[in-house]
Amino acid sequence: PYRQGRMEDCLHLLDTLAEEVQGIALCAADCPQVRQKLELLAERRMPVVTFNSDIAGARRLCYVGEDAHHAGRVAGDIAAKFLRPGDRILLVYADHGYAGHKGRADGFLERLAERGLRQEDCRVAETHDNYDETLAAVTAALAEEPDLKYIYMANRSVPACMEALRGAGRMGQVRVLAHDNSPETRTFLR
């Protein structure tokens, strides 16, 4: 089975699918191994569409998804309305290889800086879109930074973030900003 965020699983799945399908829709990390696989698929005339996170410059038909950098800038603008210079922020994203989340993170930090907030006040956690890693990172940030004011979830592990807040007794004390309209995320809206 494919476990998202695991490049080896992604490459294996692409090899398997290439023999059985007429086209592939792919959401994967931008790394040399995936680029090489896309090149081989293109040589075989296998149509590939990337979605949610692009692999810029790769041989694919098109990208379908948000402008992640712009989405991050919008998130930064929203966050800046609730923050003052010096307020501590936690930014959680998959990792720098996942272009969609990196774009969100870069746009977020860029917009905060434009609004007068320092990047030094933003702690960054790469959690590979993994529930347990996100839970551990948010729990650690809450324990180490009692003045943490804001968490920007540029990834989809929002339930892990909320579990960490609940466990630390900080629900309602720390603002959380997230993307995506998933059933899990909607349960936390009030």
Give the location of each predicted region.
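Alpha-helix termination/capping residues and helix-transition junctions
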Residues: A18-E20, L83, E145
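Short, structured loop/turn "capping" segments at alpha-beta junctions
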Residues: R84-I89, R115-C122, P146-K149, G172
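Hinge/beta->alpha junction and helix N-cap segments in small-molecule ligand-binding domains
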Residues: Y2-D9, D30, S53, V64-V74, ...
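Flexible loop/hinge segments that line or gate small-molecule binding clefts
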Residues: Q33-H70, S182-R190
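Hydrophobic alpha-helical
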Residues: C10-L13, G23-A42, F108, R123-T185
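A conserved helix-loop-strand patch within extracytoplasmic ligand-binding domains
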Residues: A71-I89
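Generic secondary-structure signature for well-ordered alpha-helical cores
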Residues: E43, K81-P85, A113-L117, A143, ...
